[in-house]
């Protein structure tokens, strides 16, 4: 599902909201999650999962095209850990509850 599809689904499920308002809400949620991660904060959505950042140490990598060894700098990457309820829904194929 793309962000556009998510917005369309949410707008269809909530006809009392304008599509542009739903788009603004979704964009605000993504922006706030991104800002929190940029600050190094943890974002926990109960029943869904938690977003955190993890540090990847510097290492020596290999260019797959040339085989040349290259230095890969240390970096911070976003990480998502699914919550118990989300894992159970995915494993059981159960639709989301309203």
Curated annotation (Swiss-Prot):
GO terms for molecular function: DNA binding; structural constituent of chromatin. This is Integration host factor subunit beta. Keywords: DNA recombination, DNA-binding, Transcription, Transcription regulation, Translation regulation. This protein is one of the two subunits of integration host factor, a specific DNA-binding protein that functions in genetic recombination as well as in transcriptional and translational control. Heterodimer of an alpha and a beta chain. GO terms for cellular component: chromosome; cytosol. Belongs to the bacterial histone-like protein family. It comes from Gluconacetobacter diazotrophicus (strain ATCC 49037 / DSM 5601 / CCUG 37298 / CIP 103539 / LMG 7603 / PAl5). SUPFAM superfamilies: IHF-like DNA-binding proteins (SSF47729). Transmembrane segments: none annotated. GO terms for biological process: DNA recombination; regulation of DNA-templated transcription; regulation of translation. Pfam families: Bac_DNA_binding. The keyword Transcription applies. The gene is ihfB.
């Amino acid at each position: 599902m793309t962000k556009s599809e998510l917005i369309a689904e949410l707008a269809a499920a909530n006809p009392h909201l304008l599509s542009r308002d739903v788009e603004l809400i979704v964009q605000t949620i993504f922006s706030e999650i991104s800002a929190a991660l940029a600050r190094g904060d943890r974002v926990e959505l109960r029943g869904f999962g938690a977003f955190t950042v993890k540090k990847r140490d510097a290492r020596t990598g290999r260019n797959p095209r040339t085989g040349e060894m290259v230095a890969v700098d240390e970096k911070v990457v976003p990480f998502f850990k699914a919550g118990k309820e989300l894992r159970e829904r995915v494993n059981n194929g159960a639709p989301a509850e309203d």
